[in-house]
Amino acid sequence: MLTTGMFLLEGSLLSPNPGLIFWTAVTFLLLLLLLKKLAWGPILSALEEREKSIQSAIDRANSAKDDAEKLLSKNKDAMNKAEVEADRIIKEGKEYAEKMRNEIVTKAQEEAKKIAAQAKAEIEQEKQQALNALRDEVATLAVKGAEKIIRMNLDAEKHKAVVEGMLEDLSTKRN
C-alpha cells in the first residue's frame, strides 16, 4: 500500500513527464519509419491496384451498358422496321385478296350471264321446236279432218262431231 501511495504522490500518468514524452515520440517515429519502409509501400500499391481494378470494372460495366443500350436501340429499330414491314405485307395481302374477290365475283357474274343466255337460247329453241311440232300436228290434224269432212260430206251436226273428236284427239296428244 505504501508503494501505491507513493506512486500517487509522485505524479499520475496524466501529468506530463518529459522523459516519457521523448521516448514515446521516438518510439512513434521509429514505428512510423518502420511501417513506411515495410508496410506503407505494399499497402499503397495494393490500394492503387485495387483502385485500378475497380476503375477497370467500372469502365467495363459502362462499356457493357453502352453496348447494351446500342443493342437495345438496334433491336427497337429492327422491331419497328419489322412492324412496318408486317403492316405493309398485311395491307398488300388484303389488297390482293380484295382484288381476287372482285375478279372472282366478276367472273362468276359473267358466267352466270352466259349460263342464263344459254338457258334462254335453249328455252327459245325448244319453244320453237314445240311450236313447230304443234303446227305440224295441227296442220296434219286439220288436213285429216278436212279429208274426213270431204269424204263424208256430212251435214252440220256430223261436221261438228268430227271437229270435236279431232279436238279431243289433239288435247289427249298434248297431255
From Swiss-Prot:
<dbReference type="InterPro" id="IPR002146">
    <property type="entry name" value="ATP_synth_b/b'su_bac/chlpt"/>
</dbReference>
<keyword id="KW-1133">Transmembrane helix</keyword>
<keyword id="KW-0812">Transmembrane</keyword>
<comment type="function">
    <text>Component of the F(0) channel, it forms part of the peripheral stalk, linking F(1) to F(0).</text>
</comment>
<dbReference type="GO" id="GO:0005886">
    <property type="term" value="C:plasma membrane"/>
</dbReference>
<dbReference type="InterPro" id="IPR005864">
    <property type="entry name" value="ATP_synth_F0_bsu_bac"/>
</dbReference>
<feature type="transmembrane region" description="Helical">
    <location>
        <begin position="13"/>
        <end position="33"/>
    </location>
</feature>
<dbReference type="InterPro" id="IPR050059">
    <property type="entry name" value="ATP_synthase_B_chain"/>
</dbReference>
<keyword id="KW-0138">CF(0)</keyword>
<dbReference type="Pfam" id="PF00430">
    <property type="entry name" value="ATP-synt_B"/>
</dbReference>
<comment type="subunit">
    <text>F-type ATPases have 2 components, F(1) - the catalytic core - and F(0) - the membrane proton channel. F(1) has five subunits: alpha(3), beta(3), gamma(1), delta(1), epsilon(1). F(0) has four main subunits: a(1), b(2) and c(10-14). The alpha and beta chains form an alternating ring which encloses part of the gamma chain. F(1) is attached to F(0) by a central stalk formed by the gamma and epsilon chains, while a peripheral stalk is formed by the delta and b chains.</text>
</comment>
<comment type="function">
    <text>F(1)F(0) ATP synthase produces ATP from ADP in the presence of a proton or sodium gradient. F-type ATPases consist of two structural domains, F(1) containing the extramembraneous catalytic core and F(0) containing the membrane proton channel, linked together by a central stalk and a peripheral stalk. During catalysis, ATP synthesis in the catalytic domain of F(1) is coupled via a rotary mechanism of the central stalk subunits to proton translocation.</text>
</comment>
<keyword id="KW-0813">Transport</keyword>
<dbReference type="GO" id="GO:0046933">
    <property type="term" value="F:proton-transporting ATP synthase activity, rotational mechanism"/>
</dbReference>
<dbReference type="GO" id="GO:0046961">
    <property type="term" value="F:proton-transporting ATPase activity, rotational mechanism"/>
</dbReference>
<keyword id="KW-0406">Ion transport</keyword>
<keyword id="KW-1003">Cell membrane</keyword>
<protein>
    <recommendedName>
        <fullName>ATP synthase subunit b</fullName>
    </recommendedName>
</protein>
<keyword id="KW-0375">Hydrogen ion transport</keyword>
<dbReference type="GO" id="GO:0045259">
    <property type="term" value="C:proton-transporting ATP synthase complex"/>
</dbReference>
<keyword id="KW-0066">ATP synthesis</keyword>
<keyword id="KW-0472">Membrane</keyword>
<keyword id="KW-0997">Cell inner membrane</keyword>
<comment type="similarity">
    <text>Belongs to the ATPase B chain family.</text>
</comment>
<dbReference type="InterPro" id="IPR028987">
    <property type="entry name" value="ATP_synth_B-like_membr_sf"/>
</dbReference>
